[in-house]
Amino acid sequence: MPTKSFIFVLKIKIIDFINIPDSLNRRVLEKTIIDLVGSIGYSIEKLSYNFVSKQDLLKLNKKFLNHNTNTDIITFDYSLKKALKAEIFISMWAVETSALELNQSIENEALRVVSHGVLHCMG
């Protein structure tokens, strides 16, 4: 009697985008991060990008960094050697404000900030 073979595909998300605005292209952001990390010789264990309000990021900045100022990004880095693991919090208010000031699209500015966050983990 012939035996049956089964192939299971397990897809593990190594990059999460939480509360990502509809205006941002998740796939473009993901590809940019993967290409950047790989080009520098690192790997990704798990990255969580959290898009939060100006007020929420200010609260995190006060609580964990003792800074009473607005910022565009805060990175909590849990990486070991060259395997990146981090929680990254991004203020869409700051992204939108910087995009206007720098005459950039919101997506281009978001790409810059998302890249900035992962670079925090690489020194």
Place the predicted regions along the sequence by residue.
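Nucleotide phosphate-binding/pyrophosphate-handling subdomain across enzymes
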Residues: 116
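An acidic/histidine-cluster motif and surrounding catalytic segment
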Residues: 1-111, 119-123
